[in-house]
Structures are given as structure tokens and as C-alpha cells.
UniProtKB/Swiss-Prot annotation:
GO CC aspect terms: cytoplasm
Keyword Cytoplasm among record annotations: yes
Protein's recorded name: Ribosome-binding factor A
InterPro entries: KH_dom-like_a/b (IPR015946), RbfA (IPR000238), RbfA_dom_sf (IPR023799), Ribosome-bd_factorA_CS (IPR020053)
Keyword Lipoprotein: no
Chief location of this protein within or outside the cell: cytoplasm
This protein's UniProt keywords: Cytoplasm, Ribosome biogenesis
GO biological process, one term: maturation of SSU-rRNA
Gene3D superfamilies: 3.30.300.20
Species whose genome carries this gene: Wolinella succinogenes (strain ATCC 29543 / DSM 1740 / CCUG 13145 / JCM 31913 / LMG 7466 / NCTC 11488 / FDC 602W) (Vibrio succinogenes)
Family per similarity comment: Belongs to the RbfA family.
Highest rank taxon of the organism: Bacteria
Its biological purpose: One of several proteins that assist in the late maturation steps of the functional core of the 30S ribosomal subunit. Associates with free 30S ribosomal subunits (but not with 30S subunits that are part of 70S ribosomes or polysomes). Required for efficient processing of 16S rRNA. May interact with the 5'-terminal helix region of 16S rRNA.
Amino acid sequence: MKEKSVKLQRTESLLKEVIPEALSTLSDTRLNSLGVVEVDCSKGKYHAEVYLDAPFATPEEKREILRQLRLAEGTIRDHCLSATGWFKCPRFHFNFDDSTDKANRLDAIFEQLKKERES
């Protein structure tokens, strides 16, 4: 796997800070409380995968949140442009980060195996 350039890493880091600010300016309270786990920009910085954390949202709520985020993408991009001074901003593709759920399931499996070995 090739290392990311320093400029790309800086862009991702800055977006990871600015996107939550943009979300906090929106009127939908479900969007205000979302946490940004990771931002992964494409090489040309035209697209960015934004991984979000909403641990207490149901699958239906997550679908609705993603729909609202698609509608608010322009506002979020405008905020990022004004906050950073950039002349272009990547298109955002929002996804929920499920790595913590997977880790919790693995921990539960390991705990169950440990109990079975002890008995």
C-alpha cells in the first residue's frame, strides 16, 4: 500500500475538524450530534469518504440521517470552503463506521470462548 502524501493527510485532517463544525450549524439535531471518525480523500481531492459515528441510531434512523446528509451536502461544502479558504472542496460521500460494532462482536465471541474453556 502506498503512503499518502503529506498534503493529502493535511486535507483529511482539516476536513475531520471542519465537517463537525459544519454539522453543528445545521438545524437537524440528529446531524448535530454525529461524530466524524475518519475522512479519506481521493488522490485528486475531488471526493472524500466521511465515516461517521452514531452509536445509538437504529438502522432506519441511519438511513434517514444519510438521506438528510445528502440533502445538506452543499451547505456542508460551503461551510468547509469558507472555513478553510479553499477554492474547491471535495464531494462528500457519507457512511457510518461499523468497525466499533465489529470489534464489540469479536470481543463478545472471545469472551464466550474463554468461558467455554474455563468450564
